[in-house]
Amino acid sequence: MSTIYQAKSIRTMDPHQPHATHIAIKDRHILAVGTADDIADWQSAWGPLEVNTDFAERTLMPGFIEGHAHMMEGLLWDYHYVGYYDREGPDGTIWPGLKSIDDVVAHLKQIQDTRDDPSEPLIAWGFDPIYFQGRRMSAADLDLVSAECPVAVLHASLHILNANNFIMDAADVKNADNSEFIRRDDSGQPTGEFLGQLGMYMAMRTTNLDLLAAASSPKTLQTFSQVARQTGVTTCTDLANPVPEGAEVAMRETVEKDSFPMRLVVAFQGNSLPPEESVARMQALQDKQSDKLRFSLVKFVADGSIQGFSARLKWPHYYNGAPNGLWYIEPDRLREYLTAFTQAGFQCHVHTNGDECTEVTLDAIEDALRAHPWPDHRHTLQHCQMASRAHFKRMKTLGVGVNLFSNHLYYWGDEHRAITMGPERAGRLDDAGGCLEEGVPLAIHSDAPVTALAPLFTAWCAVNRLSSKGVALGGESEKISVEQALYAITMGAAYSLKMDTEIGSLEVGKRADITILADDPIVVGAMGLKDISVIGTMVDGNVHLNQGRDA
C-alpha cells in the first residue's frame, strides 16, 4: 500500500530539503517528501495515496543508525547487571546502579542464595572499579558470593573480567604462560582480574559458556532489536563477530522477517583467522547478504580500554602512573591484516582507544593504501578517543573516517580528568568539533552494551560535553551543534557503513526507515535532547511502536 504520513515536523537530513511535513511511502521506499501543498501533485503522478494522520503531532526523522554496538547487548540481559549507573532493561525495568564493591558482592550473594541450581556459573556484567577510589575487586571478594561454582564479573568495557578462585584454579593461572593478561598484586600474586580478549577467554572457557556464539541466537537478536526500537534505532551494527559457519544462516532467518524492527550490519572479526583464511571467509559471506542483513565490514581491536588501563597511550602515558596498556594485535600483524583486506577491497573498522594506538593504526592504513591505492575505502577508526588535531588532519589526508565514543564524556569524563589522562588530554576527549573542523567524516556511538544504546543521549553528550558530575570537558571548539549531532547519528553513521545511498536521510528513493519522536530535537535544543521520547520506528515502511508511548 502507498501511504502519505503527515507529521508536525519532518527533519530530513537532506540539505536540498531539510524540513517537511509530509512523506509518501511505497514499496518499502520513500516516494516523495514535501508539504500538504504537494499532495495533489503526488496523487496526480502516482495515483491514490492514503493520508495517515497517526503522527500528525509528532516529529519524523531518518531512522537512527548505531554505527558501533554489539549483539551482546541482547544477550547480557540474561545475566545480572552490576553497573555503577542505573540502566534500563529491554522490558523497561530500571536496574539501580551499585555504588561500591561491597554492594556488588552483596547483590550477587543474594542472587546466588536464591538460585535453583547454585552450581551453575554465575555471570554478571557492567562492573567498573574506577569509580571506587582505588579499590579493585579481588578473587576473595567473589569467593564471598560462592567458592563452589564459577563466578565471573564482566567489566563495563568488556575488556576485563573478575573471577573467583574457582575459575582461577580451573584456568590454572599460576602456571599460565601469558602472564601479561593476568593482573597481579605487588607481591606478584594473581588478583582475579583477566585482561584483554585472551585473558577473558582463559577465564570464560572454564565456565563452558560461549557468549560470542550465544550472541547470535534468535532470542538474543530479538532482545537486541527490542532495545533498538525503544531508542529509535533502525540500523544497528554488531561490530566484531567471528561469524562461524552457519551463523549467517541463523541470523538471516530472524532478521529478514518484517516483524524484526531493524537492519543489522555485522562486522566480521578479521583477526579470528590468519589473514588469507580471514579474507576468504569474508568473501564467502558476501552472497549471504540481504537488504536487512549485511556482512560488509571487517573489524579489528588493536588495543584495550582507557579506564581499564589496557589502552595504548603516548607519552606521558597514564596520568596516575599506571603501566601502558596492551596491544591486542601487534602493530606488524595489524599492518598485515589491513593490507590483506585493503587489497581484497573490504572496508575496515579499527578499535583504537589510546592515542598511541591511533597513530600506529594510521601508519598501518597508510602503508596498506600505498601498496593498494583505493580512493573510497572509508576505513574508519572506532572510539579514537584521544585523537589530536594532527591525527584528524592525517585522517583527512588518508580518507579515514572516525566514529567517536561520545558517551565516555558523561560516564567516565570525571575519571579521565582525575585518573587516566589528566585535565588537558581529557579536555579533548572525543573531540567531535575538532574532527569536523578538520574535515573528517564523523559518526558517534554508544558501544552498547558498554553504555546504553540511546542515540539521542549520545548526541546530547557530543553537544554538551558534560560529565556525570556536571563538569564541562574542553571548550566550545570541541563541541558540535544539535544539527551536527543529529547528522552524526543518521547520515554520518550511514556514510561510515557505506550505506549513505540507502539510508540516513529522508529523500526520494531511499529506504523508508524512520524514527518517530514525541518532540522536534531542533526545537527542544541542546540540553533537552536526551529526554525526547521515542514513539516508535518504521523499517521499510513497517511501523513498530513502543508500548506505552501513544502515537
Report residues per predicted region.
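Acidic (Asp/Glu)-rich catalytic clusters
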Residues: 254-258, 283-290, 372-374, 395-399
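Short, solvent-exposed loop/turn segments at the edges of secondary structure
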Residues: 18, 74-77, 259, 295, ...
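Glycine- and charge-enriched low-complexity intrinsically disordered segments
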Residues: 546-551
